[in-house]
């Protein structure tokens, strides 16, 4: 009986250890021991930076190019049917191989600087309906306006208060007013650039103000503001009497830049360029500042 109730030394030791771990106060230790027993800091639960970014950036790793690609796909997706209803036959039609006939087609291309065929048609029809201009006279009226721009420029301030020499009883200002309702006067004049170029050379009549613009005798036929459209396939389809020279291109380019500088009010203009040798003078101030006394 006494042997069954007695506890073995090992079990007594285990109970002693358990009581120390639960009820006994912590024993005093040195500062070094306390430092060693300090538990490690708990990891913070702050969200990483990527999770705080917008979904489109975080999902793509924050890359600018990937974000732009993602946004572009979203814009395109609105024009496409739902994924389960995509019809790839339209895509196949776009990817068909091009044939020789593809290169023979004519396309009505719209360029901002020059009149389109649709705009010119609208001008001619309005001339006929509003100003009673016979359709057979539309071409010669357009040429008359283009020649006027050749000599006086094609800005919105160009004066057209004169009678037409080609259409009896018509004031050119009314005809130009119709043009300005549909397109700019410069776009209209640009369409006839090759025509006025040929007309000037064949009749030996350069633009009236070529000297005032600083052109030389060698470059005088380029002294009109739509010169850059001479020979353009988008203009009136006639062959230029001759191809403009490099000096003529240079003269027109410098003169155009000078006009831009003046119109922007920078206070600086170039001197008349010496186009014969391809050089220009240094710019001089329009209103030089005088030293204060």
UniProtKB/Swiss-Prot annotation:
GO molecular function, one term: structural molecule activity
UniProt feature, compositional bias: Low complexity: 18-37
Coiled coil: none
Region (Disordered): 1-49
Subcellular location: Virion; Host chloroplast envelope
GO cellular component, one term: ribonucleoprotein complex
Taxonomy, superkingdom: Viruses
Keywords, alphabetical: Capsid protein, Helical capsid protein, Host-virus interaction, Ribonucleoprotein, Virion
Entry keyword annotation includes Ribonucleoprotein: yes
Segments of skewed composition (Basic and acidic residues): 1-14
Record keyword Nucleus present: no
One protein family per Pfam: Flexi_CP
Family, similarity comment: Belongs to the potexvirus capsid protein family.
Oligomer status and interactors: Interacts with host NbANKr; this interaction targets the capsid protein to the host chloroplast.
Function of the molecule: Required for genome encapsidation. Forms ribonucleoprotein complexes along with TGB1 helicase and viral RNA.
Descriptive protein name: Capsid protein
């Amino acid at each position: 009986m006494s042997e069954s109730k007695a506890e073995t030394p090992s079990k007594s030791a285990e109970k002693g250890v358990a009581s120390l771990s639960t009820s006994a106060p912590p024993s005093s230790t040195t500062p070094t021991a306390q430092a060693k027993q300090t538990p490690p800091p708990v990891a913070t639960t702050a969200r990483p930076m990527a999770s705080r970014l917008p979904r489109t950036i975080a999902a793509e790793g924050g890359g600018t190019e990937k974000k732009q690609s993602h946004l572009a796909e979203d814009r395109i997706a609105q024009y496409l049917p739902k994924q389960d209803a995509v019809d790839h036959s339209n895509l196949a039609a776009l990817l068909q191989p091009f044939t020789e006939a593809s290169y023979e087609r004519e396309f009505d291309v719209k360029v901002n600087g020059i009149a389109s065929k649709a705009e010119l048609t609208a001008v001619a029809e309005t001339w006929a309906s509003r100003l009673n201009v016979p359709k057979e006279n539309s071409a010669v009226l357009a040429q008359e306006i283009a020649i006027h721009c050749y000599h006086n420029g094609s800005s919105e301030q160009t004066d057209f208060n004169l009678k037409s020499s080609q259409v009896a009883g018509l004031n050119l200002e009314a005809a130009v007013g119709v043009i300005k309702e549909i397109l700019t006067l410069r776009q209209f004049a640009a369409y006839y650039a090759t025509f006025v170029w040929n007309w000037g050379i064949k009749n030996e009549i350069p633009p009236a103000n070529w000297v005032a613009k600083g052109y030389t005798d060698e470059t005088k036929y380029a002294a009109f503001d739509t010169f850059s459209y001479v020979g353009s396939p988008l203009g009136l389809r006639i062959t230029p009497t001759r191809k403009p020279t490099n000096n003529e291109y240079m003269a027109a380019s410098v003169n155009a830049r000078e006009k831009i500088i003046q119109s922007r009010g920078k206070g600086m203009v170039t001197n008349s360029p010496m186009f014969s040798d391809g050089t220009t003078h240094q710019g001089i101030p329009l209103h030089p500042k005088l030293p204060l006394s």
